[in-house]
From Swiss-Prot:
UniProt region (Disordered), positions on chain: 47-83, 104-137
Basic residues bias: start-end ranges: 50-64
Listed name of the protein: Putative uncharacterized protein DDB_G0280905
Biased composition (Low complexity): 73-83, 115-130
Species the sequence originates in: Dictyostelium discoideum (Social amoeba)
Lineage top rank: taxon: Eukaryota
Amino acid sequence: MIIQKILQGAVLDIVQKKLVDKLASNKQFQQMSVQFKDKMDEITGEKPAKRNIHGHNNHTRSSNHPHSGAHSNINHNNNNNINFQNVKYTNDIHENARIYEQQRRLQQNGGGGDSSSSRSSNNNNSTNDNKPQSKNYFTHLFESFKEELNDEADKLNGKKK
């Protein structure tokens, strides 16, 4: 029984890594992610961000790019001043991961602030081993899927939480 649980854990880790890599590179998943976010904004009454989800990568930034900075919803120069209510996700899953990590860091540090205070808070957090290790965006996404699947399996098996 214990060996079976260990094997299941190892298999889940492998599947998680492969799934995350596959989803991170899948344009259709990125488009569905943006459409889902827009639908959630519509349901919750938030104003959806203007995005182009038809394959144009509007996050390519270079000085000779014809649309350099024209479509950006995010201030890339000041990563510590994100307002949680105004965060806009994009059709780039790696950019979404970066935004998620910024939000997570800000929540851990108790809100905004400058980068020096964030660094000192991070140093304090690393010395405290009693706090659980925080998850990256893809792990969080995968665990959300896994939790939903387990809940559905429990419902099918007649178990209640």
